[in-house]
A protein has these predicted regions:
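Short Asp/Glu-rich motifs
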Residues: 38, 49, 78-79
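Residue-level detection of the helix-turn-helix DNA-binding "recognition helix"
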Residues: 20, 34, 45-47
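Short alpha-helical DNA-recognition segment
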Residues: 24-41
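Short, basic-rich loop-to-helix N-cap that marks the start of a DNA-contacting helix
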Residues: 46-60, 67
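Short basic helix-loop element that most often maps to the first helix and adjoining turn
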Residues: 13-28, 57
Length: 103
């Protein structure tokens, strides 16, 4: 499997996990993203690359934001996103798992 194919499959897997986590069908995501279901299926399966604008629309349909992070910053961003010992240790921008609003 080529590096490009591996990346497409990885992106598709992330999209699939996000979609299933929201209990959405491929049809629903495709409609919200403004593409056909067959096109969405190809992207989610990693069989086809997508334009950046299409990925942005899909991500937003799934409540995600596509971001480009400078490579030297990736370790720091990954560290921020790693779970810690308790909810008190979560960065301020991560939703608490208990659903309480302190504001």
């Amino acid at each position: 499997m080529s590096m490009d194919t591996t990346i497409l499959v990885e992106i598709g897997g992330l999209l699939r996990a996000a979609r299933k986590g929201l209990d959405l069908t491929q049809e629903q995501v495709a409609e919200m993203a403004g593409i056909s279901r067959p096109r969405y299926r190809e992207i989610e399966s990693g069989k086809s690359a997508a334009r950046t604008s299409t990925l942005i629309n899909i991500a937003r349909a799934l409540g995600l934001e596509l971001m480009f992070i400078p490579q030297p910053m990736v370790p720091a961003v990954n560290a921020l996103l790693q779970p810690h010992g308790s909810d008190d240790d979560l960065p301020a921008f991560v939703a608490s798992s208990n659903g309480d609003d302190d504001a």
